[in-house]
Amino acid sequence: MQESEGVLYMRVSFRIALAGQVIGVSALYEQTRTFCKNYLTDAPASFEVAVTPVDIAFEREKNDREAAVEGHAPGNFSDEYLETLALYRKIVERLLEWDTLLFHGSCISVDSKAYLFTAKSGTGKSTHTQLWKKWFGERAVFINDDKPLLKISAQGVTVYGTPWDGKHHRSTNTSCPLKAVCILTRNTENSIQRIDKKAALPMLCQQSYRPCSPIGTQKTLALVDRLGSSVPLYRLGCNMEPEAALVAYHGMNQ
């Protein structure tokens, strides 16, 4: 039990497995354990994190600031929802110790090889990967439709599913070798080209979660640089017709 500003909170404790590590979680709300239900484990924890009311207040203030910058009204988010954001923030900052970073993109695998699509919000990442699912059927598996984890090693990059999977809730508790990263742009015609790390790096940095601490930021940027050197990089100009999925797939498998 924890007291904050005169309010008593019953702690909710559980463990989850993410990106090859087991995290001991101390949360404020039972809904957070339910949110993580597909990742629960009884294995010993690699490290532990605890969410506090201060963490939830930080998430609310952050969302309000971002809404103001974008000219939107503040979101009326529940404390339970904001706790899930605070929890992921704490986890991913610790996972940097294991060369693992959070990346904003939609990741789908075909025949056990993962393809990660990234772009500015609203470009159509999820719409595009849904086209892959329609084309490839059971061969295609959504790893994570919004915030996958990428573990970078000398053997390559492995992508992991997480329960933080966007508004469509498309994810799988699995891992898969990352075949390629593709920067998606809108176009009237479908075309794909391979690009070098220098061309891709600004978007890769923008779409990677960077902690506030200088050490965490430095570690993240080093991992992003390694990511750009570890897998092929592409730029896809596409419309939302089904053929866009085939153009992308064949372009990354030449």
What role is predicted for each listed range?
Residues G6-Y9, S13, A19-F35, F77, ...:
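Glycine-rich, often acidic-flanked micro-motifs
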Residues R11-S13, V22-I23, A27-S46, T52-N63:
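A metal-dependent hydrolase signature that marks the N-terminal structural subdomain at the beginning
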Residues T41, E93-E97, K134-G137:
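Short, intrinsically disordered, mixed-charge
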Residues A43-I91, M252:
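Charged, amphipathic alpha-helical linker segments immediately N-terminal to NTP-binding catalytic cores
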Residues P74-S121:
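Glycine-rich adenosyl-nucleotide cofactor-binding module
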Residues G124:
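Conserved glycine(s) of the Walker
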Residues H128-T129:
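Post-Walker A alpha-helix
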